[in-house]
């Protein structure tokens, strides 16, 4: 113990320590024909008013030689009540280049699960979150406190990486509304809430430097807010063509899809004997094309299967233990990047069409993003 403490205290005297602060500011103005922005939203950082502060993200990356890295960040944003909220998103250490090709993350981190969950708001390709993240993983995605082990094997034209984590799913305060929720049973109770295990495997194949393929297989198993279990599986695939190969710049085309399914064990809160399981799936197809320097257009189609389970009669009305409505959404985005000093910032114009139960909704958004600082430790 004494030796380890001495090592940590003296390491800065000879190690190369680098601290890199980052700042990301995202805001959006928009309008929707839906009855409210909540009808077409779902994620805590989705537009929720005619003007919304999606996030002021303050971060700090730590790098110590090649063996240790870390990251901490907090996000300030306007919530669904149009009040400022603060969220500690991540705070972890990453031990790199361990024997056998392993890396270890310890602390609070966004889980590597699917194509978006591990990305911060400023890295999104669209104004709003995808339905898989917001409807299956939570209003702020899936974050856990624990440890994650990653193994990477690289070959000539291919690589394989697998990450597996175990910990406690972070339950955000917004999800615990209190007594008024007693008879408002959406799909939120299916979110992970306690012990959680996740795994993500990525297969990469570079046919050439100009044509690249990525296939991801994902799984998550853990306790849910019904005090039962949710099991989730997903697959994502992306093909990328780059005019300049591995060099920056030039035209670039990306095509992809994501398919996810979950099995939710539910229990009606008013009748402990009313229990069961329900399965639900979601699908997305997306494409983006950088057709000129600083200009990118993107399109995304999403479908969420609607499911109901656990019917109970309450004061003359039928209520369900699990109730998730069917949704279809098409989003078109046009992004213009700008150089502000050494940093990339952007303006994004997006149109979305949502097919909701009983109504269709059209929404238009203009988003701005200001980014300062180098790449963050992931």
Positions of predicted regions on the chain:
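Outer membrane beta-barrel
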Residues: 16-34, 45-172, 195, 202-209, ...
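Residues that define the transmembrane beta-barrel architecture of outer-membrane proteins
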Residues: 49-54, 85-89, 141-145, 193-197, ...
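Outer-membrane beta-barrel "beta-signal"
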Residues: 149, 332-338, 360-378
């Amino acid at each position: 113990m004494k030796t380890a403490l001495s090592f940590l205290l003296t390491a800065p005297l000879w190690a190369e320590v680098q601290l890199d602060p980052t700042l990301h500011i995202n805001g959006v103005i928009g309008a929707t024909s839906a009855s409210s922005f909540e009808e077409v939203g779902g994620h805590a950082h989705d537009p929720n008013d005619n003007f919304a502060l999606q996030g002021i993200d303050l971060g700090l990356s730590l790098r110590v030689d090649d063996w240790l890295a870390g990251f901490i960040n907090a996000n300030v944003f306007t919530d669904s009540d149009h009040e400022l909220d603060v969220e500690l998103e991540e705070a972890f250490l990453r031990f790199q280049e361990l024997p056998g090709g392993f890396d270890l993350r310890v602390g609070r981190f966004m889980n590597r699960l699917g194509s978006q969950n591990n990305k911060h708001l400023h890295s999104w390709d669209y104004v709003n979150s995808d339905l898989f993240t917001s409807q299956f993983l939570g209003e702020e995605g899936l974050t856990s406190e624990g440890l994650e082990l990653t193994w990477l094997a690289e070959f000539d034209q291919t690589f394989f990486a697998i990450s597996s984590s175990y910990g406690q799913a972070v339950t955000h305060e917004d999800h615990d509304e209190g007594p008024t929720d007693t008879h408002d049973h959406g799909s939120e109770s299916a979110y992970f809430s306690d012990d959680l295990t996740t795994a993500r495997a990525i297969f990469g194949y570079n046919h050439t430097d100009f044509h690249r393929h990525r296939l991801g297989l994902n799984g998550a198993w853990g306790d849910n807010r019904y005090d039962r279990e949710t099991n989730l599986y997903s697959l994502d695939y992306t093909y990328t063509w780059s005019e300049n190969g591995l060099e920056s710049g030039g035209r670039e085309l990306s095509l992809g899809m994501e398919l996810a399914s979950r099995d939710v064990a539910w229990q009606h809160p008013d009748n402990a004997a009313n229990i069961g399981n329900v399965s639900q799936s979601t699908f997305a197809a997306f494409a983006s094309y950088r057709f000129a320097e600083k200009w990118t257009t993107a399109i995304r189609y999403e479908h969420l299967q609607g499911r109901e389970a656990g019917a109970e009669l309450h004061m003359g009305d039928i209520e369900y233990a699990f109730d998730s409505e069917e949704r279809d959404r098409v989003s078109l985005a046009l992004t213009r990047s700008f150089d502000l000093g050494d940093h990339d910032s952007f303006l994004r114009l997006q149109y979305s069409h949502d097919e909701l139960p009983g109504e269709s909704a059209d929404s238009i958004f203009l988003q701005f993003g200001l980014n300062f600082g180098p790449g963050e430790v992931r």
